[in-house]
């Protein structure tokens, strides 16, 4: 039976429209922390906050997260098809990394397509004194293993995003046609044990208009 992707969008969209269109980093992180959400300590909080918000607000219409895994790879939700939720700051360029390549291919084979909900917007960044990073580190209470490893390598600390103003939310139908036309392979390097990580799918947001079935425009 063919999937009516627009019908699924019509179920999800009224809920997504209730989401705040401006995210203050401190408020979002504290909200996740107070509600014992996982990954509130992560520096790339915009992605984790969107996943957290969807988990809390879409759970009545979706299975959250999707219980089936492809190998070890999960999808964020399930409503007739697997779904993933992604956040993207326009300052990061036009390309976005999505899920594991083989997991996406297998899910498309099982269901015909995978749904992506992509939040796109402009981020504001921490100042040179890194006050936001300092505040976030204080919330964590102790230095994370990631931070210890960074210092050991002598690597500079990346500037944190302090807020995000959402300009649009796109509902993308990722099927074989879209994957073949617009998907490329993103190699992630190696795991801590030296083994190569599985490649992911990289999409150019400027090219996927004909795969985008629905857009919430906040510009």
Each language-model region and where it sits:
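Nucleic-acid endonuclease domains
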Residues: 1-73, 78, 87-219
């Amino acid at each position: 039976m063919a999937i009516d992707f627009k019908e699924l969008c019509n179920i999800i969209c009224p809920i997504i429209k209730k989401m705040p269109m401006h995210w203050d980093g401190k408020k979002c992180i504290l909200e996740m922390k107070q509600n014992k959400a996982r990954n509130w300590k992560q520096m790339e909080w915009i992605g984790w906050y969107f996943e957290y918000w969807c988990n809390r607000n879409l759970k009545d219409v979706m299975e959250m997260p999707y219980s089936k895994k492809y190998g070890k790879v999960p999808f964020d939700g399930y409503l007739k098809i697997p779904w993933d939720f992604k956040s993207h700051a326009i300052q990061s360029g036009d390309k976005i990394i999505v899920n594991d390549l083989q997991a996406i291919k297998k899910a498309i084979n099982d269901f015909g397509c995978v749904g992506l909900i992509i939040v796109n917007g402009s981020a504001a960044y921490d100042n040179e004194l890194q006050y936001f990073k300092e505040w976030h580190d204080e919330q964590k209470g102790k230095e994370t293993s990631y931070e210890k490893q960074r210092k050991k390598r002598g690597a500079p600390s990346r500037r944190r995003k302090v807020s995000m103003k959402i300009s649009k939310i796109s509902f993308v139908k990722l099927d074989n046609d879209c994957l073949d036309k617009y998907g490329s392979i993103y190699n992630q390097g190696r795991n801590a044990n030296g083994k190569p990580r599985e490649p992911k799918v990289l999409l150019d947001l400027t090219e996927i208009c004909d795969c985008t079935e629905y857009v919430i425009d906040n510009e």
